[in-house]
């Protein structure tokens, strides 16, 4: 209310049941995404339960934190449930964490999603943070797969660590002229409590 936010999305929350409890406190403002290991035997059932019984609205993964390729067939039942329930899938690719974090992993390249996105054209996949340093690959993925969108959230400080004179303004322009506004999801981002809403992320994007 302080910042005039109409809704807040939570994509991790210490387990699906715990996140559902948090969302239930302000169901008109809070939106939760399930977040659990996709390769487990019961992962598809857990996702269905999280959506149908707990009321969560999507599925979130951190690709560089997984111990198998994102396209591993073991996760296909999960993608099938995403298609069945018509829920969006938010998958973080690119560098992970702050300084000293993960800069290389078998799942760090957004193009790793190519085959999954092709196999499940009815699922909306979202790559956050403009691709988080993997700009070219994210654009190529979006070119090949019309069911892939991007979001703009985060500080996007990674632009200082890539080739080229990138700024948030230039990123907006590049994605606007390639994939179009309808596939760009505006977001701000934050992290663990008690940090709260990072208003400066909002102001940076409005300015640019």
What are these regions (language model features)?
Residues 53-58, 78, 84-88, 119-123, ...:
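Glycine-enriched alpha-helix->loop->beta-strand junction motifs that scaffold or abut catalytic
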Residues 33-36, 55-60, 83-86, 114-116, ...:
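Glycine-rich loops and low-complexity Gly/Arg-rich segments
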Residues 124-126, 131-208:
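H/E-rich (His + Asp/Glu) clusters that bind or coordinate divalent metals
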Residues 2-7, 27-31, 118-125, 182-184:
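Short, surface-exposed connector motifs at secondary-structure boundaries
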Residues 17-24, 43-51, 71, 100-118, ...:
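Distinct, well-ordered alpha-helical segments
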Residues 6, 11-108:
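Active-site gating/metal-coordination segments in enzymes
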Residues 95-98, 121-124, 153:
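Short, flexible active-site loops
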């Amino acid at each position: 209310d302080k910042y005039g936010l109409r809704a807040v999305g939570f994509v991790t929350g210490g387990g699906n049941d715990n996140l559902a409890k948090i969302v239930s406190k302000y169901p008109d403002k809070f939106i939760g995404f399930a977040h659990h290991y996709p390769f487990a035997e019961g992962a598809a059932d857990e996702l269905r339960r999280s959506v149908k019984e707990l009321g969560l609205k999507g599925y979130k993964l951190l690709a560089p934190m997984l111990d198998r390729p994102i396209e591993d067939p073991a996760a296909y039942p999960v993608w099938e449930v995403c298609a069945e329930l018509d829920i969006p899938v938010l998958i973080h690719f690119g560098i992970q964490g702050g300084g000293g974090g993960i800069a290389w992993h078998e799942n760090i390249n957004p193009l790793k999603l190519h085959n999954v996105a092709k196999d499940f054209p009815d699922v909306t996949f979202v790559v956050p943070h403009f691709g988080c340093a993997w700009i070219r690959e994210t654009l190529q993925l979006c070119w090949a797969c019309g069911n892939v969108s991007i979001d703009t959230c985060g500080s996007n400080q990674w632009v200082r660590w890539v080739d080229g004179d990138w700024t948030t303004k230039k990123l907006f322009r590049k994605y606007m002229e390639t994939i179009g506004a309808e596939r760009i999801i505006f977001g701000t981002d934050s992290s663990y409590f008690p940090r709260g809403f990072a208003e400066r992320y909002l102001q940076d994007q409005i300015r640019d």
